[in-house]
Structures are given as C-alpha cells and as structure tokens.
C-alpha cells in the first residue's frame, strides 16, 4: 500500500490531469466527481488532512469556478439544473468539509485561495427560492456544512464567511422550507457570530436576520443552534432584544418571551454580564407589560379565546414573576415606575370583570382544576398577586403604595379557591405576609377589618359539606341528603 503522501499526491495528480484535458468539460464531469470523491474519503482521516497542500484547494477552486461558468452559460429554464451541475460541486463541498475538520492549516488555505467567496456564490445559486431539485438541495446543504467547518475555531475564516454570507445568505437560508438547510445555516451563523457582529444586527437593514432566527426557532423548537444563538448572544444585547420585540407579531413575541423565561429560570448561575443584560431586558418588558396588560380583558369575550395578544401579556407576567423571585434581580423591578400600580390596577379590573358576568375571570369551583389549563387566563390573577407580593418584599415604599391603592382589601378578596387560578390562596397569603412585614399601618388595616360572614361555600356544598360559624369558630358539617321522592 502506498504511503499517505504518495496516495494524496496521486489523487491530486489525477485531478490536475482531468482539469487540463478536454475531457474536463461538462459531459465528463462524472470522472472528475469520482476523483474528488476519492479525495473526500482520504480527508476523513486526520493524517491526510494534515498533509494537504494549498495546490489541492486551488484545483477544487478551479472546478467550482468551472461549474459556475457552466451554469451561467447553460440555456436551461430558471432553476433547472442537470444532475451533473449539482453532483460535482456537492462532492467538492464534501471534500472541503472533510478537509477542514479540526485542521487550521486547511482552513487557512481554503480562505487564502478564495474558496469561501466562490463557494458562497455557488451556494446562493443552488439555494435560490425557485430551485426545488433534490440534487441541488444536496449541494446546497453540503456547501453550508463546509462553511461551518471552515469557520469553526478560526477567527479569520469566521470573518471571511461573515463578510460573504451576511446578511443575504443567512436570510435566504433561515426562511428556507428545508429543515436541514435552516439547521446548517444556523450552525454557520452561530459559529461566526460574536459580540461585535451581534450589535450590527440592531441596524434596521440587518434586523431581519435576528427576526428570522426567532421565527425559525418557533418552527423548529428542537433546533439547538438557533436556541444557542438567542441564549448565548441575543440575550446579552438588550438593545437588540428590544428592537426584535418591537418588530415582531404576537406569536413571534411569545416565542421570544419563552426563550427569555427559559434563560431566567435556568439553574446554572448567571455571569455578571448575563445578569446585567437580563435586568435591562426585564425593565423593558416591564414597560411592555404596563402598555399591553389591559388587552387581557379581551378574554372576557368567548370569541376572543384565540387572541394572541393576551398570551403575550401572560408571558410578560410570567417573566416579571420569575425575575422578581430572584434576589439578585428583584431591586431592578421594585423601582420600575408604574409597574406595581399597573399590577394592582389590572388585578382590580380582572376581579371586577369576573364578578360582573360569567367569564374566564370568574372564580370556578369544579374540583377539576378548571376546564382548560392551557387558556391564557388560567393563573393570571394568581400571578398578579405573586408579582405584587414580590414587589413588596422588604420594600416599605411599595407596601405604602399598595395601601394607598386599596390593594390589601383587593388581595384579601381573592383568597377563595379558584380552579382557574391554582395556588391563588397561597399567593394571596404570601403577598399579605410581605405587605405587613415590619409595617404597622398595614397590620392595623387588616386588624380593623370586620367579619362579614362566610364566603361562597358552593364548593363545600358540592362535596356534601357545609360551614357554620359558632362562637367565633368555623365548623364543617356533613349535609344530610333529602330523601328521594
């Protein structure tokens, strides 16, 4: 068996000969494809990758340039490529993909001979929206994989790929119908992006790339690369998050907010940079909640149950509850202008709406945990009370605000069991505890309240029980069933 150096030199000589002969035209591309395939197989092994010289990559550049020229002069319907148009460049991309695996010298050679620029031009041809042929799609995918491998761990190559692919190639790939194209392009984007590049996405002319990442993630929620792009890069740039949110539709906002909630809820400790960025994002989302919170009242109408905007409001509230439950983030929202007032106000409005007519905000006593736990209104009042309690934790100023807004009586009026608001009673007790801690004024207010009889006991009756008050105490008694007639 020939030594690795000789085998590689032999395949390279074959390729050089093929390119120099008349048979190197389109009708004989199958021969060239076979030679490149053998080279691809060799590059699967590290020893051959390490022996590769720049002239090999110059030969592959010649092939790709020849393919590009052939496609340009071919008199074919738009997007209609022959198999030979696609199979040879696909094999070239596989060869380059293999050559760049954990091999910085090959990454440098690929970049230096101009293969990145030529490859991106050809990839864009195969990735045009009207191109639907499977062979072209395969070449498209292989080209993206090559770009990812040539950029991996190589800053200069990352910058070269970014210069050629941003924003047009990324935009066309992220909205592509093929899931693999979306996945591979997001891998390339993640590999190339850094803090400086993230900041450029805020430019209105470039923002569509960031928007497309979130939209693609909503379509493919198991796509790890898009998840990492948002978590590791977008969420470190509050200005970008703000620009993305303000440009999104309600369903897209829900996706972004769920990603933010996931970041806040993660168990791993945050870095100082992550913590600072999330606090800035939370302050922005606090303003959004105050602006949008009253749209939740649309849900009082049965016809509005499919509205997306109220779902956005519930996700905003989820985030605010989670942020204020962590001591390191609490103070940034305790001082947010208008947030506490908005929470008390919308609690009052939803509570009143539930009393005025039968709707999703009416307390339900069914012993079945509500009819639809996925409804946007489920848990909304409980989470409002949770937020109010968090904002008042060891904060005298906010305790006083709730007192002035008559919020204590409002919270106490929400202490009954409500299947539409799991743990409502517990969150109300928690909020009252935080409102009265080291606050004599609020304690005296509660102490001065008069007993007004028993609350609605329909739930007890449905269980065959009734409550009686005797000597200042409550007693539970079973209800005797009336004899059947």
Swiss-Prot record:
InterPro entries: ARM-like, ARM-type_fold, Ataxin-10/CTR86_families, Ataxin-10_domain
Keyword line: Cell cycle, Cell division, Cytoplasm
Any single Gene Ontology cellular-component annotation: centriole
Localisation: Cytoplasm, Perinuclear region; Midbody
Task performed by this protein: May play a role in the regulation of cytokinesis. May play a role in signaling by stimulating protein glycosylation. Induces neuritogenesis by activating the Ras-MAP kinase pathway and is necessary for the survival of cerebellar neurons. Does not appear to play a major role in ciliogenesis.
PANTHER family on file: ATAXIN-10
Official protein name in the record: Ataxin-10
Protein source organism: Xenopus tropicalis (Western clawed frog)
